[in-house]
């Protein structure tokens, strides 16, 4: 339509029209050449909005699109989910998303580079009832599931979170508390700032309060895995 309209313009207006078009083209080429990062910045939200409904039972396609629109408009990104509850996207970066799906559950995704040309998606689903426990999965950017063992060789075990007793007095306290820590629970968190995965020991949250207090002096700090050479390593 613009071309048809331009035919009826005088030469002066034609020249101005084409100058404007050239300026826009130059700006576009500059952005395309220098702004590769800004193009890749669209990828996290694009992957999220394109996620199959089968992988997002509580959030509809409209919910997911609304999250993005609200945050980009500097608004609180809260929606009514498929079951009538409230869900909120709390973080959105070029390669990371975090959603408070329900008051007791969260969902995170992170785009990770496998090599110079390939990225994959890592997701962490966490449910707290009341102790938190997480499930980690990996997908292609087209949401085809990948074998987790290829990208996360091993998970921390109970002994990774607990320091052995150092003296005879501690041994009895340690053994008593350790026997009650009979189920490994841990919360995993992806980072929006770097390519790390942090595991926090949550077994004490389900134990009796007295036993949890006895175990507390023997607990190690959260364990951090770093994404390197296409997999998470401790």
Kindly give the residue locations of the regions a language model identified.
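Terminal domain-start segments
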Residues: 42-112
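Bacterial Sec-dependent N-terminal signal peptides
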Residues: 14-47
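Short aromatic loop motif centered on NTY/YTY
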Residues: 148-227, 233
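Acidic/hydrophobic-patterned starts of short beta strands in beta-sheet-rich repeat architectures
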Residues: 116-126, 194-200
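Short consensus segments that form the blades of beta-propeller domains
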Residues: 99-100, 126-132, 211-216
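Mid-length scaffold segments of soluble, non-membrane domains
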Residues: 120-154
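Short, small-residue-biased leader/transition segments that mark boundaries at the very start
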Residues: 1-13
């Amino acid at each position: 339509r613009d071309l048809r309209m331009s035919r009826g313009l005088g030469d002066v207006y034609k020249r101005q029209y084409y100058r404007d078009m050239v300026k826009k083209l130059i700006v576009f080429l500059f952005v395309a050449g220098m702004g590769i990062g800004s193009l890749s910045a669209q990828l996290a939200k694009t992957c999220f909005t394109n996620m199959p409904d089968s992988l997002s039972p509580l959030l509809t396609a409209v919910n997911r699109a609304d999250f993005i629109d609200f945050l980009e408009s500097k608004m609180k990104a809260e929606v009514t989910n498929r079951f009538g509850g409230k869900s909120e996207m709390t973080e959105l970066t070029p390669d990371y998303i975090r959603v408070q799906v329900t008051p007791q559950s969260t969902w995170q995704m992170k785009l990770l580079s496998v090599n110079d040309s390939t990225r994959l998606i890592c997701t962490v689903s966490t449910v707290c009832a009341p102790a938190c426990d997480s499930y980690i999965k990996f997908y292609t950017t087209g949401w085809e599931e990948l074998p987790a063992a290829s990208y996360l060789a091993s998970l921390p075990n109970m002994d990774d979170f607990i320091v052995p007793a150092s003296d005879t007095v501690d041994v009895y306290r340690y053994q008593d508390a350790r026997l009650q820590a009979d189920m490994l629970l841990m919360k995993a968190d992806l980072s929006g700032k770097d390519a790390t995965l942090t595991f926090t020991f949550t077994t004490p949250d389900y134990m009796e309060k007295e036993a949890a207090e006895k175990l507390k002096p023997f607990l190690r700090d959260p364990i951090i895995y770093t994404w390197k050479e296409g997999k998470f390593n401790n």
